[in-house]
Amino acid sequence: MDFSQFNRKASGYECLGPSVVAEAASYANSCNLSLWMSTRFKAPVDNDFLAKWELRHTAVLNHLKLNILDKFPHAEIDMELPLQTVNLCGNKLFGVADAVCKFPNGQLMVCDAKSGKKKLSHWIQVGLYGYMIQGVARSKGASVPEICGFALCYGNY
């Protein structure tokens, strides 16, 4: 592998995304070097792949939002919510939840849109988003929101 194509993340911004942690936790990717690299370096960008992914992901996001509005008309929905960084076993965890639904009783449901194949790691990833939301509330001394559920929406609708 040619590591010269990778750019070092800025000092203080070394972090892992929930998808990387989820793949390691589900043993979909159990390579320790991969975790180490993901924390410290950005992989080279493949613009063609990224453009195709953005189109598919946007379609699934729209489908997810329509489903949430249909099933939970009284819920407040935050789409593509950037979550604050939290500490997970000495690593910074940063991510963006595709949708967080807040119900009138204060409970939350965390949702993620997926444009690829179904994987066990997707459930772990959406669970980590819930952990992050609760962790930020704890660190601020605020009341910790109750997570009442998780949802995944796949592009094969």
Regions found by a protein language model. Give the residues of each.
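Metal-dependent nuclease catalytic cores that hydrolyze phosphodiester bonds in DNA/RNA
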Residues: 1-107, 117-119, 123-124, 134
